[in-house]
Amino acid sequence: KPYISTSDEHIEDGTSTENSQEILKMTEKRSRKMETLKDNLPEPTYYGNSQAKKIFVGWGSSKNVILDIINNTDTNIGYLHYEYIYPLKTEKLEELINNDKELVLIESNQTGELGKLIKEETGYEFKEKLLKFDGRPFFVEDILDFLK
């Protein structure tokens, strides 16, 4: 059975409308929900030496391999891990930016999606990126080779 959808706005009871006042009301309602969500989401978590100059910023599967390096080598790095990327929380990230840390974007995709979102939200553009997009996870060697 096909699914049919309208491109019009819907109102509280789920029916569609083209009424501009109702559209404005529903758009504002979604905006309030997004602000509430942002207020309740945690900041990203920082791992590693707080004095580290080189800090990786990432999300998803890069976390475990970075923590492996932090916990099992003498490599002096930090890692800022985003568990939720939208709406983006930026307070901890902006502290790192303002403290002249060397930030490295680490992502398992070709285009650096999180980096683009960070640039859109903060204006910060990563000078260094470690992107892997061959379908394989990051390995400790990938990061250690990058750091050489």
Show which residues each predicted segment covers.
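Flexible, low-complexity linker and terminal segments
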Residues: K1-K148
